[in-house]
Amino acid sequence: MCIRDSCNHSLAHKKDRKHFVVHKCVNTKCPYYLHNLNKVDKKDLKEDYGKNKYKLHYIYREFQIDFFRMDLNTLPKNASSLKFSKHDQHVMSLCLTYKVNLGLSLRKTAQALKDIHGICISHQQVANYCKTASVCIKPFVDNYDYKTGNVFTADETYIKIRGIKTYIWFIMDAAKRSVIGYQVSDNRGVGPCILAMRMAFQHLKELPKNFKFIADGYSAYPLAAQQFFHEFGDKFKFEITQVIGLTNDNEVSKEFRPYKQMIERLNRTYKASYRKTNGFDNIDGANYDLALWVAYYNFLRPHKPVSYTHLR
């Protein structure tokens, strides 16, 4: 039985967030509040607003969207077909090699095909080929069983779409270095974090023993973990190990800093390929570009930890 169950005070509507509404019990005689208050350091109680450093009252988040029912396999719109009218599959493979593997821009890819292979092709046709390839390969990449270990690490970074910040979420298996969850979103809320976690956990019936999920101090990760426990119960009950800041100020940061640096290096690797695009025109373009990059990173790119071979 939850301590809160013995309090009959109704919850007060406090805040409206993008994906949920925050309700709070403001009863100062609530057993949940008194239980937490007893655990507060006595020094903080003597300070003005000292107890405000802690979240003592019962808080309930009422989600307006069910992120556990949303389709993970969204595909880019308006992709061209694999029926070639002017070129063939060989030209398409050359476009993908220069654009994805070598990280060239669309225009430089078109220029490379003309200068090296004598093939005249527009940069828009290169983009169409990339979008078509993404439609074909994204379901495979998203649903592949990577046989994950018991340590996941996550982080988010941002890109620009028409000059506006858009966020990329990555979840990596620390043992195999594979990207097992990713998401493009126009916000930094808990919703896209849940979707990325769903992709990472989709082949697990329950969490492995000694499971660790390592992230930074951003609040979306603990909130997403709470929702997994609420949705699936004890089989997906886990705590977020938060590595905060740039220096090892505590034992947790000292022990788990290498995992945080691992996901930060992944961010830098992706940003290096993204930088040549000079941003995207729409979120569909960001989606297909990211899907192709994850496919390249997981299946084609040589990696130092595995003797410069690919991960799979």
Predicted regions and their residues:
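Cysteine-rich micro-motifs
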Residues: 18-34
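Conserved small/polar residues in nucleotide/adenosyl-binding loops
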Residues: 1-5, 309-310
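Active-site proximal helix-loop segment of RNase H-like, two-metal nucleases, encompassing DDE(D)
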Residues: 251-255, 259-282, 300
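Acidic/histidine-rich, metal-coordinating catalytic segments
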Residues: 209-221, 244
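Short cysteine-rich clusters marking metal-coordination/redox-active sites
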Residues: 4-7, 25-27
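Short, positively charged, Gly/Tyr-enriched micro-motifs
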Residues: 29-151, 156-162
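C-terminal domain-tail junction helix/linker
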Residues: 276-312
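Active-site beta-loop-alpha junctions of metal-dependent nucleic acid enzymes
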Residues: 131-132, 182-206
